[in-house]
Amino acid sequence: MKKIMLLLMTLLLVSLPLAQEAQADASVYSYQGIISHMAPPASPPAKPKTPVEKKNAAQIDQYIQGLDYDKNNILVYDGEAVKNVPPKAGYKEGNQYIVVEKKKKSINQNNADIQVINSLASLTYPGALVKANSELVENQPDVLPVKRDSVTLSIDLPGMVNHDNEIVVQNATKSNINDGVNTLVDRWNNKYSEEYPNISAKIDYDQEMAYSESQLVAKFGAAFKAVNNSLNVNFGAISEGKVQEEVINFKQIYYTVNVNEPTSPSRFFGKSVTKENLQALGVNAENPPAYISSVAYGRDIFVKLSTSSHSTRVKAAFDTAFKGKSVKGDTELENIIQNASFKAVIYGGSAKDEVEIIDGDLSKLRDILKQGANFDKKNPGVPIAYTTNFLKDNQLAVVKNNSEYIETTSKAYSDGKINLDHSGAYVARFNVTWDEVSYDANGNEVVEHKKWSENDKDKLAHFTTSIYLPGNARNINIHAKECTGLAWEWWRTVVDDRNLPLVKNRNVCIWGTTLYPAYSDTVDNPIK
């Protein structure tokens, strides 16, 4: 009997840990859904690996950490190379003479943030594994189709406590990650939005006067190519000096979702993934693995400002209009703004998730920028930018953009006139000469001497006339003399003004008597 009792007690003691282990397994399995909704740890818990899985992980870590590449030069965009600079040129346009000048310029920009537009949004999610290669530079990330382990996401919306801003995604596929992001946003909307009713978007904007597509791609990233299909920057007219355009990228960032850094490269892969799998997918030193470490969600606006003005203050006028500052009292800036237009391409900021294109005059621009300034349920964010880190060492992957381009500047010289007025008691003669400047095919200045057809002809009082001069007139000389009737000084000089600048209205008047002539030279509305 004692033996039987001893046997029963032994069986009971053995079965108790087995039951506890089975219960623990069931508990683990119950949390193997897509997303853990409990407060997650700082990094996702990992199941013990089998010997084969440990070997796979060790080989992956050794392979990726052994890849030899220069992180500063693997993501490089080399745009246009300018060999020949077109010469200076000039042409007549209405009542102005336009001088167009070209200069070789270069732009070198390091971009840690990569723009997202709607056509790429499906490829962009926090934690995505991509190759750091030319496709990433061109904003066409090559996502690695491998099985994934769990990742921890965090969001930077305010007020979230007790790890409410974090979530563990057990199987980091695109759909599961997106579900995780939506869960974080819903959690904030349900628990914290009433306490923080007006979350102002973080504002980030950059701007560049437009000269070539290569220049703007270097400035804003490869996404600009697709944006310009709607923006339609008129590079041809810009090159001819007929228009001036500026492109502004205005981001309203509602929130950013980050991915916890992996403690080792293998931590981002499913346990069945091998080094050979990665090699077969083309992962090597020329195509090292990287991951999308953060994604900014919000509203992204590209604005093109355009004017046919040849003023050198166009950029100042555009900047003033964009910032909503007053230009009252500055006639030149007022005229530029009143005669300028804009075109905006808007991504995000509405529940419809559509791309919006708006045209108008600059007075309406500020209203568009104010829309979507706050994050709420009516203004859901879309992916607008992302950053990538190298999986080897979690170092930031920066895209180096370089391009040369031709900067085109134009200057308008308005036509002017000289008004002659003779009311003196004598016979007078005028002599008016000037130079007209143009440019040959090589950009060399060509100077042609001109003179008034009525030079040195007798004029009796009261005589008036106007001599119209083109905008390229320079070195204006005005000479007037009067007949005194004196044998020893038959002609006396009244006016001898030389190398005068062209102005809108120059009034030269002579009067008086043969012995006491007089004159005046006044200017109305001088041309600046």
Curated annotation (Swiss-Prot):
Q: Does the keyword Ubl conjugation apply?
A: no
* A Gene Ontology BP annotation from the UniProt entry: killing of cells of another organism
Query: Subcellular location, in the record's words?
Result: Secreted; Host membrane
Q: What Pfam families is this protein classified in?
A: Thiol_cytolys_C, Thiol_cytolysin
Q: Which top-level group of life is the source organism from?
A: Bacteria
The similarity comment for this entry is: Belongs to the cholesterol-dependent cytolysin family.
Q: What is this protein called?
A: Ivanolysin
| This protein's encoding gene | ilo
